[in-house]
Amino acid sequence: MSKPVNLVLLYGGKSGEHEVSLVSAASVLKHLDSEKYHIIPIAMDKSGRFHRHDYNDLLACSDKLPVVTEKSTPLEGLLINGRLAVDAEIVFPVVHGPLYEDGCLQGLLELAGVAYVGCDVLSSAIGMDKDMARRLACINGLKSARYKLLSWHANASERQQFCHEVASEFGWPLFVKPCSLGSSVGIHKANNMDELNAAVADALRYDEEILVEEFIVGREIELAVLENSIPCGKPRVSMVGEIKVNHPDGYYSYTAKYLESSQTDLIIPAQLNNSLEEQLKQAAANIFSYLKCKGMARVDFFVNDKTEEIYFNEINTLPGFTSISMYPKLWQATGVAYPDLLDELINLAMVHHNCRQHLVTNYL
């Protein structure tokens, strides 16, 4: 029997999605095969400090993993002298939001010379920015909701003018979103000017740039994409899932996702005709390729029920792995069990790492 791979499970973080990470990490820990991997849980608290845990101490934590316990050991940092502070071959990041999904963490791990699960620096950075992701995803004619951007540099007068312009151009309701955040953190539905002003002010608490977009009447559709293990093979796409929100918020808000999820239905497979289903799968695969994604991504769309027009919403290059998260659920429904999915992602990460290690870096 081969020696288990030393694997860091990294979770927590300085992010508005900190709590989501703790739940995702508990689910991943539960499904990782301890005979294949020597699992080293490392948590980052909201101040950016790292804490090492013993795997066996966390086995009873079924709902979410703790950040600090009486038995956890503080680390000076994730890296020491440019290398991981612990002896590990690979890092499985289960962290969300800025610094973790936008290429920063990925670049740090590449500098440390360690393998990591998921998209690389480039695709993470593009995928995290809703504006840039839409520009590339829609390069060949795919639609997205019309939107406008606002920077936190804008003064009060400029913000007020911006709000009047988007309301006049797009009408009500409007959606306000931080440009580089996920899990519906900081997202608001605005039905009037007072709500829009409040939503803009709140969203700018989470990000330096926000977008305000028109409301698309349609079904919320999600697909999971997995890189092909065959070199140059087409991305693998799961069956299609649909999110049906019955929550009073009226959209897939943070509350509807995580706090009151019983009021949201995850429908797998989505009831679509064959032609529309194939169009969505092809669009998801294309977007994965356009953004040069590695490992995994979840691609989200809106579909107009009457016209069957497809609108790209966003791509998530480090999707949630909670028990209710669509990415693992879609693959389970497609025939890929949760533990097998984790194995596949880890194997893909090792392949990319080995490739990077063989690149020439000395030109003399």
Curated annotation (Swiss-Prot):
Pathway listed: Cell wall biogenesis; peptidoglycan biosynthesis
Cofactor, how bound (note): Binds 2 magnesium or manganese ions per subunit.
Named cofactor requirement(s): Mg(2+); Mn(2+)
Cleavable signal peptide: none
GO molecular function, one term: D-alanine-D-alanine ligase activity
Positions bound to Mg(2+) 2: E314, N316
Keywords per UniProt: ATP-binding, Cell shape, Cell wall biogenesis/degradation, Cytoplasm, Ligase, Magnesium, Manganese, Metal-binding, Nucleotide-binding, Peptidoglycan synthesis
Residues involved in ATP binding: 167-222
Cited Gene3D superfamilies: 3.40.50.20, ATP-grasp fold, A domain, ATP-grasp fold, B domain
Catalytic activity: 2 D-alanine + ATP = D-alanyl-D-alanine + ADP + phosphate + H(+)
Compartments where located: Cytoplasm
EC class (word): ligase
Main location group: cytoplasm
UniProt binding sites for Mg(2+) 1: D300, E314
Top-level taxon: Bacteria
PROSITE patterns: ATP_GRASP (PS50975), DALA_DALA_LIGASE_2 (PS00844)
Gene Ontology terms: cellular component: cytosol
InterPro entries: ATP-grasp, ATP_grasp_subdomain_1, D-Ala_lig_Van_CS, D_ala_D_ala, Dala_Dala_lig_C, Dala_Dala_lig_N, PreATP-grasp_dom_sf
Residues in ATP-grasp domain copies: 134-347
Known EC number: 6.3.2.4
GO terms (BP aspect): cell wall organization; peptidoglycan biosynthetic process; regulation of cell shape
NCBIfam families: D_ala_D_alaTIGR, PRK01966.1-4
Similarity comment: family membership: Belongs to the D-alanine--D-alanine ligase family.
Physiological role: Cell wall formation.
Name the record gives this protein: D-alanine--D-alanine ligase
Record lineage: Bacteria, Pseudomonadati, Pseudomonadota, Gammaproteobacteria, Legionellales
Gene: ddl
